[in-house]
């Protein structure tokens, strides 16, 4: 099976769907919103071609479910807020938003939400239907998606840790895994494995920057949010817990060791410095803003997180119940690729053990994601200077 066929979230609206298990991502988007507003404010001051009539925006790696339109709402509200600050100096522009993800993404679940979304925009923002146009642009964001110099703003959240392929060199000429017992570039991985993953990320992220810089107008903006490495050695990434759960099944005799050793996630979690260096080395963008922040795995399920818990989501204090929620969130993201390699039957067992490990680390305060927000502006061509 081709990798792109399984690089997707769980679709639909069932109990294991991404739509029902993305409260954490909702919180991250809320934390990014002030930076998004500032980015839009700077964009509208830049006097890009045709921006006063039609702002062209893309959300790269949009996934599915309500969070997709939460991002769209935040972008629209930010544009309208800046317009109000200008006291109607400019007419309210049309906004054209392209939702991008791989071809297997559940775009239909998003499209079904659009009629009510448009009505809500009209009621809350005064945007008449037709003044915000939303469509899909399926394809890999590591390839060209839009014509040259046609876009004003590109946004991506929690996507860039996904690589275009599993790095080469993880199996010797004799067919022996060089990453035994691991499923990605973890702290326990050997240095050659860590280098192979970093090299693949560098290649992919450089391609991402180069291709999308060509699609943006000069001075166009890009806002990226991604998982990043922290400085704390004892912090556990969710993929570490997933790795531990799969190893448990091997030890218990439910899974062959060779099956584990032949599996490597096309995922790399970079450091903030690695991201910064690649941007500077590629050279198409100026870094306007860079910040890191932490969010606990169980964020979205506690009043202390300052998260607007939805009415049908009960707030629990028991760590085992929280751990089940964390396991469901991770399952919604990784189940398709895990099932393609290990089989669907063993998925419940993997995440049952994942939840057990999560319940142990949640009380320690070491179960969190480090996150990076980076705001970029495309440098002008020499002919534009």
UniProtKB/Swiss-Prot annotation:
GO function term, MF aspect, one: metal ion binding
Gene Ontology terms describing biological process: methylation
Binding site residues for Mg(2+): 179, 261, 263-264
Residues where S-adenosyl-L-homocysteine binds: 18, 62, 67, 101-102, 140-141, 157, 159
Pathway(s) it belongs to: Alkaloid biosynthesis
Tissue specificity of this protein: Expressed at low levels in young leaves but not in mature leaves. Barely detectable in fruits (grains).
Record carries keyword Transferase: yes
Function: Involved in the biosynthesis of caffeine. Specific for xanthosine and could not use xanthosine 5'-monophosphate (XMP) as substrate. Catalyzes the 7-N-methylation activity of xanthosine, but does not have 1-N- or 3-N-methylation activity.
Name of the protein: Xanthosine methyltransferase 2
Organism lineage string: Eukaryota, Viridiplantae, Streptophyta, Embryophyta, Tracheophyta
């Amino acid at each position: 099976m081709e990798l792109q066929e399984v690089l997707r979230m769980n679709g639909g609206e069932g109990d294991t769907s991404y739509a029902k298990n993305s409260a954490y991502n909702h919180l991250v988007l809320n934390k990014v919103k002030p930076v998004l507003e500032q980015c839009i404010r700077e964009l509208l001051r830049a006097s890009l071609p045709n921006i006063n009539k039609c702002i062209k925006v893309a959300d790269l790696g949009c996934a599915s479910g309500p969070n997709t339109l939460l991002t769209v709402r935040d972008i629209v509200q930010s544009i309208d807020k800046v317009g109000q600050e200008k006291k109607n100096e400019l007419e309210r522009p049309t906004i054209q938003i392209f939702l991008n993800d791989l071809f297997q993404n559940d775009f239909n679940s998003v499209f079904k939400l659009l009629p009510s979304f448009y009505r809500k925009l009209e009621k809350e923002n005064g945007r008449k239907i037709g003044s915000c146009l939303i469509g899909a642009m399926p394809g890999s964001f590591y390839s060209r998606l839009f014509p040259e110099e046609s876009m004003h703003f590109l946004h991506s959240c929690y996507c860039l840790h996904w690589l275009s392929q599993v790095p080469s060199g993880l199996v010797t000429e004799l067919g022996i895994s060089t990453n035994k017992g691991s499923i990605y570039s973890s702290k326990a991985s050997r240095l050659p494995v860590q280098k192979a993953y970093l090299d693949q990320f560098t290649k992919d992220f450089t391609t991402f920057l180069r291709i999308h810089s060509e699609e943006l107008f000069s001075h166009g903006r890009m806002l990226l949010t991604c998982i990043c490495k922290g400085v704390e050695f004892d912090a556990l990434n969710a993929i570490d817990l997933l790795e531990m759960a799969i190893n448990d099944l091997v030890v218990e005799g439910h899974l062959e060791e060779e099956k584990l050793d032949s599996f490597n996630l096309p995922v790399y979690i970079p450091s903030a410095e690695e991201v910064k260096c690649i941007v500077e080395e590629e050279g198409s963008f100026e870094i306007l803003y860079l910040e890191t922040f932490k969010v606990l795995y169980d964020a979205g399920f506690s009043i202390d997180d300052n998260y607007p818990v939805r009415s049908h989501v009960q707030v629990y204090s028991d760590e085992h119940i929280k751990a089940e929620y964390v396991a469901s969130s991770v399952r919604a993201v990784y189940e398709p690729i895990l099932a393609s390699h290990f089989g669907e039957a063993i998925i419940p067992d993997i995440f049952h053990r994942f939840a057990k490990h999560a319940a142990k680390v949640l009380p320690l305060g070491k179960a969190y994601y480090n996150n990076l927000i980076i705001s970029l502006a495309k440098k002008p061509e020499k002919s534009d200077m």
